[in-house]
Amino acid sequence: MHAATRVFLVGAGPGDPDLLTVKASRLIREAEVVIYDRLVAPEIMKLVSPHATRVAVGKESKRHPVPQHKINELLIDFARTGRLTVRLKGGDPFIFGRGSEEALALRQAGFDCEIVPGITAAQGCSARIGIPLTHRGLATGVRYVTGHCRQDLPLDLDWQGLADSQTTLVVYM
């Protein structure tokens, strides 16, 4: 691994800059390079230094102008420069954010990275409207599932397990 961590996979949370972690806010402001998704709110992008290099890699349903392998290559290329690089992702990088794929690609290329968690969309939305994801006596757990998988694979969900009345079910895009 290279000496110091200069690549950070940062969760931007649900869009409100006040809901960023202190570390996420600091890294976004200090970053020399910001590689960001379409789901990152414009209010959060305003925190990025005007001197930073910004690279948009946003994806939409069935439209990926920058495929994941190219995003991985970008991260590795910027890691090689030694510049402080933030990979800014909506929500949390490890909740359907492909952060684990990006971290693995960096590590396989010999670069360490640090994960900075963010508030997930499910957490932010439930808190905003006052409906808890768990509640003693009602919901003893939370289950996150995706409604989509890789295009070459069928969606294979445990429908019976998902019907557990004691578990809150959160379905992501």
Set out the residue ranges of the language-model regions.
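Class I S-adenosyl-L-methionine
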Residues: 1-17, 22-116, 124
